[in-house]
């Protein structure tokens, strides 16, 4: 079981021959406040240092889409007479009668009316329209994405990406903008997909969390704030990193502390998760989705 924040700080102060505190959060001692800040800094640095298995998280979510009807007026931004606009916002793409490609909800005017980001190309009454959410929030503890883990679990297809800016605009603006495979990119700190779904799909990917701290109730946190908080990272690494940073900030000689820290950090990395067994006669790598496993008939069905 991991030490809590109080125990970690007490270990640091004991090893540095400083006054050992009885509490950390709210402690007026400048040394305690500084050690708390440095321990958080050590955590932030360690998050970026390595793909710790304790910080690797699977993220899953369902896409949202609704097909309904609306009225359009040529040359205006207004879609009216929608049965309900509940839940719609600017993260929804619009595909429908007289609605140009790559059009999004701009504002929700009332329970039956919205404005869009592009002008309607013609006038119609009761035309079909699909509102599809293509922009999704990243998890609150998101640090970085894990490559090649993005899947449409409903269709059992890997999602393609990250798409660069030029490809993205080509997909959203070109004549051929849709296909059976979903593309993705991270834009504006949001997870975006294309083309828009017209049905609910189950998507997922893995990411590295920056939540190296856990509240006593199990809630993931990005910093130590309470004495009962624990870390999912190695306690000894946290103690050694904090001691090293304390000496650095005081302009003390850090040679010995740095050697101890690097030595133990390398051990912690080596022991953090298993490694693949390497063969002197390896077989071809596993095929994901390609020509080798696309059926001759019934493609996409």
Regions found by a protein language model. Give the residues of each.
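Glycine-enriched, solvent-exposed interface loops adjoining structured elements
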Residues: 1-73, 86-100, 104-107, 111-120, ...
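Short alpha-helix capping/helix-loop boundary micro-motifs
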Residues: 75-83
């Amino acid at each position: 079981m991991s030490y809590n924040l109080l125990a970690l700080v007490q270990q640091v102060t004991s090893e540095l021959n400083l006054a050992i505190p009885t509490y950390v959060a709210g402690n007026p001692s400048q040394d305690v406040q500084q050690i708390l800040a440095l321990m958080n800094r050590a955590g932030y640095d360690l998050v970026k240092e390595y793909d710790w298995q304790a910080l690797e998280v699977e993220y899953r979510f369902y896409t949202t889409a609704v097909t309904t009807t609306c009225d359009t007026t040529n040359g205006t931004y207004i879609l009216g007479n929608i049965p309900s606009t509940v839940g719609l916002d600017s993260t929804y793409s619009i595909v429908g009668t007289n609605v140009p490609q790559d059009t999004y909800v701009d504002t929700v005017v009332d329970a039956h009316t919205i404005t869009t980001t592009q002008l309607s190309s013609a006038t119609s009454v009761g035309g079909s329209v699909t509102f599809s959410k293509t922009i999704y929030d990243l998890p609150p503890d998101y640090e970085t994405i894990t490559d090649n883990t993005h899947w449409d679990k409903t269709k059992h297809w890997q999602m393609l990406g990250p798409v660069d800016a030029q490809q993205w605009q080509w997909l959203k603006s070109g004549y051929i903008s849709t296909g059976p495979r979903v593309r993705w990119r991270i834009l504006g700190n949001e997870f975006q997909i294309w083309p828009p779904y017209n049905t609910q799909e189950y998507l997922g990917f893995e990411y590295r969390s920056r939540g190296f701290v856990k509240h006593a109730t199990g809630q993931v946190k990005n910093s130590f704030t309470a004495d009962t908080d624990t870390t999912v990272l190695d306690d000894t690494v946290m103690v050694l990193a904090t001691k090293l940073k304390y000496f650095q900030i005081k302009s003390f000689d850090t040679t010995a502390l740095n050697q101890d820290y690097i030595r133990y950090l390398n051990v912690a990395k080596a022991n953090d998760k298993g490694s693949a067994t390497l063969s002197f006669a390896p077989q071809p790598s596993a095929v994901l989705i390609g020509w080798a496993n696309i059926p001759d008939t019934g493609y996409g069905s």
